[in-house]
Amino acid sequence: MPSRGCSCWLLSLALLCSLAAAKEQYHEFVIRETTVKRLCKSHNIMTVNGQFPGPTLEINEGDSLIINLINRGRYNMTLHWHGVRQMRTGWSDGPEYVTQCPVRPGQSYRYRFTVAAQEGTLWWHAHSSWLRATVYGALLIRPRDGTSYPFDVQPTRELAPILLGEWWDMNPVDVVRAATRTGAAPNISDALTVNAQPGDLYSCSSHDTAVFPVTSGETNLLRFINAALNTELFVSLAGHNMTVVAADASYTKPYTTSLLLLAPGQTTDVLVTFDQPPGRYYLAARAYASAQGVPFDNTTTTAIFDYGAANNASSAAIAMPTLPAYNDTTAATAFTTNLRGLRKAELPSRVDESLFFTVGVGLFNCTNATAQQCGGPNGTRFAASINNVSFVLPSSTSILQAHHHGAPGGVFTADFPANPPVQFDYTAQNVSRALWQPVAGTKVYKLKYGSAVQVVLQGTNIFAGENHPIHLHGYDFYILAEGLGNFDAGADTGKFNVEDPPMRNTVGVPVNGWAVIRFVADNPGVWLMHCHLDVHITWGLAMAFLVDDGVGELQSLEAPPPDLPLC
């Protein structure tokens, strides 16, 4: 049996080896206009380094990144590293006016952070206006050198990441500005995309199709990212099953399925064995549209998986998968409820903060306004809220800067409600019109460092109930349960999965239903929680947690960097 001194020496040696294995990467991300042609029309779009999608970042767990953002575009810009915990480095999280002021044209800012205790697929995207329509890319986090994936079958190789997106035949910034000006719903997208290509089912798009060469008999790792702005997506690969092994950079128990569901912001890693007759097979994606009577992009995007066989003539028919109906909530629920965490959850036994948040769309009444400003139903303006508070971004400084300097006055208030102001039948078919109008404000909810937090996310049917993908910055959380109708603590708490719940950073709150999440507030700073349908965050479906510093340096937010942009 080794002595205590020997054990300590071995532990120190292991720690030093671990630190030595970690690396630091430096990248320059230059924002600039680039001309691209889709659907027979050329557009000048915002890109990073002229690439669309943007550069793929590939690191190992424990590595650090320095990203020098140089803005040579014509819009303010910030970048968000979606799903990265940003432990104590909230200044690099990216949402404009929440953790930083935007990087203005002609300016630059260096994002600095370490990716620790996370493996799998994350991504990065613009967090200003609707610029993430074209400014996005993959962030791949592999196990440390010498460590294999925790899969029974190791992949022969990894394919290029599969980024699902949306394309507008106009400037997406103009789309959201028009909606904001008029109070109406924004124009829907003109196409869905795979790796920025619509696929050959669209008019004037026969050559705009992503192709993935594959080898017969191999098992490959495929990484899916839903980078679309406003569309949840069903995804299927003709003739092939997919075994889910990770979601949002958290490993899952293997789950074999022919269908994936990804909400905007979510990622899914799957293993696929290419064991079908040599040929070409479509990967297809189309909308899961849960809101009744709401327009959506009902097109289908495709990519081709090509075995490359000698007899695989280009004129041969390409196998097409069968996708569910657009509104198939049963199929959507079946996928999400089958996900389980790979290991037993490290779940806090106590709950210090028990919160109940209603999430949904509403309407602002118009008074003394012109018809041009009231383009919503019956002369209203569209709105959205959490607990009837429609979130408003500050403009004079960021929330985190105001908090750090101890000067919240005029920027935010720390009075976000723990419960909705009025209890009602949240999912009723006819909700009283008196409950449709939220209150606008910039409110945060304060959490003590280390507190165990449980949030019931309750969807409402105030105006067109639908599935809401809720993303929490700075944290992963356990999804304990989800269900339809109104959450009933007495009946539904017993349904909680406390053994192996999936861990994610974005949860789909079912249409006219609920989801329960739990996390420990161990990361000081200001952390946005919002719907990842950009139309909804534009309307105010967001709030922020303000997590106080703990004890000592390692439980406190780092000092702001010297190049932090000013408003």
From Swiss-Prot:
Cu cation 1 binds at H80, H471. Residues 1-22 form the signal peptide. Coiled coil: none annotated. It catalyses: 4 hydroquinone + O2 = 4 benzosemiquinone + 2 H2O. Cu cation 4 binds at H468, C531, H536. Cu cation 2 binds at H82, H125, H532. It is found in: Secreted, Extracellular space, Apoplast. GO terms for biological process: lignin catabolic process. Residues 30-146, 158-310, 415-551 form the Plastocyanin-like domain. Its cofactor is Cu cation. Belongs to the multicopper oxidase family. The keyword Transcription regulation does not apply. Lignin degradation and detoxification of lignin-derived products. It comes from the Eukaryota. PANTHER family: LACCASE-17-RELATED, MULTI-COPPER OXIDASE. The keyword Metal-binding applies. InterPro entries: Cu-oxidase-like_N, Cu-oxidase_2nd, Cu-oxidase_C, Cu-oxidase_fam, Cu_oxidase_CS, Cu_oxidase_Cu_BS, Cupredoxin, CuRO_1_LCC. This is Putative laccase-17.
